[in-house]
Amino acid sequence: MEKALKKWFPVFVLPTLAAFCVGFIWPFIQGIYLSFCQFITVDNAKWIGVTNYVRALTDETFGDSFVFTVAFAIVSTLLINGIAFAIALALTKEMKGTNIFRTVFFMPNLIGGIVLGYIWQILINCVLSNLAQPLLALNSTAGFWGIIILMCWQQIGYMMIIYVAGLQNVPPDLLEAAAIDGANAIQTLIKVKLPMLMSSFTICLFLTITNSFKLFDQNLALTSGEPAHATEMLALNIYNTFYSRAGAQWKGIGQAKAVIFFILVVVISLSQLYATRSKEVQA
């Protein structure tokens, strides 16, 4: 059996590997090369060195988008994981209808980001108009919290499922031992459940942080970066630089921003994984 698997292994792997190289590796390498070029199309790319990176890093809109994205990532990560964990704790108690509640909370995750963006744009603008407040296109504060609400509504159910699975995998023996030792519910949560859930926290934090930094379609549909790029996140800023600005130089600058963005997300994600996985070892 093992000989047969080894014999036919390349046959099954090569198509997937070829598709991965053609669809990801080669475009990624080409994208890095183009970030050092001035171009309109790939065929007329002209090497100009690090000029695109200098212009990208000195672009005020890129810096403002970075600050906005970091603030959004921090707030959304804390809210999503805090609320999802609280709901998971409630749904792992002995109560009727828990499966129905899990399904209802998870359903928003199945809706596309563009659709959600337009739905929430209508809802939030209706609320703002009733309160005699400026609409999203003229209200950066409402735009920020609108994206936060949208992201939480979409992601909480997914993270809740991960936390529920983690809570259900806590060994009953540990809970019984804690009860025998006289630990109350809060002590059991802090001393027993949380250490056993570090792997779940690692996954959920990784997903929420990366999703927050990569957010594009919801941002495009809900605010489009208005007013005056005040609610423009990094992904949308890169898109607007590449497609919405006139001039051949902006293509290369947009590509340089994309490479910087990729490095930023990788560094932050790996740092978070290292920090939380070290807690798993201690646990």
Where do the protein language model's features map onto the residues?
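A structural signal for multi-pass alpha-helical bundles of membrane permease subunits
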Residues: 2-283
